[in-house]
Amino acid sequence: LVCVMWGLHACQPATGLIVPSPIYVDNHYHGPADPEITWNPKTKEWMIFYTSRRPFKDQASYVGTPVGVAVSKDFVHWNFAGYCSFDGVGGKPDSEKTYWAPGVIVEGDSAHMFVTLKDDSTPVWGGPSNIVHFSAPLDDMISGWRRVNTVVDTPISIDATVIKNGDHWDMWYRDRPTEDTGGLYHAQSHDLYHWTLNGLAKGDINNVEVTKHTYQEGAYAFQWKGYFWIIADPHKGLAVYRSKDAEHWDYQGIIMYEPGTRFFDNTRARHPSVIIRDEKAFIVYHVQPFLEYNPDTHEAGNDIYQKLSFLQMAELEFKDGKLFCDRNKVLYE
C-alpha cells in the first residue's frame, strides 16, 4: 500500500535500480522471441540472443529471421548490440536464411550456438529445419560465428538446449521424425562436436497422460538447488520438470500461465531461458501482450499487433522441492 501511495521509489533500496518491464524491446521489428541469456566472461557482460521475428512483414514474420543480440553490463539496462553473422553472412534485420531459438553456451575460450536453421525461408513457416552447431570466440559473439556441423538433420527438429553435466553435455530439442513420434528428444556428447541421438526423453516429459500436453517446444535446461530442471513451452504457460540425474524427469506442473501486472507482462510466458546469479535464478521469457490465444491451436498471431513481442525477466523461487515464480515482484539490482 505504501508503494502504491508514494510510488515505487518509496520502497526502492537507496542504492538499487529497478529492473524494467519489459527488460528489452527490439527497436527495429519489435519481435524479439526465444531469448537465451548467458554471461560472457571475456567482455564481462550479460548477453541475450533471440529470434528476431518481423511482425511488420505480414506473411514473412516468422521466416527470414536473424539472431539478434542485446547486452548489459549491469543486468538492468539492456541495449541492442547487433544481429549475428554466420560464416561472414548476415548482420542485418532481414536474413536470407531463417534462424530460430539460439541455444548458447560458453566453454573455455569459445562460445557455442546450437540454432534452428532453415535454408528455405518461404512464408509462412519455411522449409525443413535442422539443428546446426556454430562456434565463435568470446570477444566476437556477434559476427564471429563459424559453422561446425549439423547435429540433428531430421526436417522438423527445432529449439535445442544444451547443458554441461559432469564429463559430457546433454541436449534436448523438439522433433517429430514421423507423424506419431513428436516430442522432446535427447542427445549427448563428450566434446560438443560429436553427438549421439538417444531418442525421446525419458520420464514424464513425453507422457501425455501425466502432463496433458500434446505439444511442447522451447525447452530450457539448467541446474539449481541440487536438481536438473527443464522448463518447456506448451503454449499454456511454462511446464516444469525436475530430475536428479538429467535422465528421468518428473513433472511439477505449470507456472507463469496467469497474466502478470507489470507493463506488457499481461499474458502467458513463452519460450524461456534461465541464468543463475549469486545463487538466485532469473528467468527471461518473451510475451505477446496483444495476442488472443486460442486454447485449441498453437497460433502465433495474425496481425501486426498480435505478433509484437517483448522480453521480460522475473525471479524463480524454490520451495519444498518445486519452482515458483511471482512475475509481479519488482526486481532490484
Residues of each region from the PLM?
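Carbohydrate-active catalytic/glycan-binding domains of CAZyme proteins
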Residues: 11-333
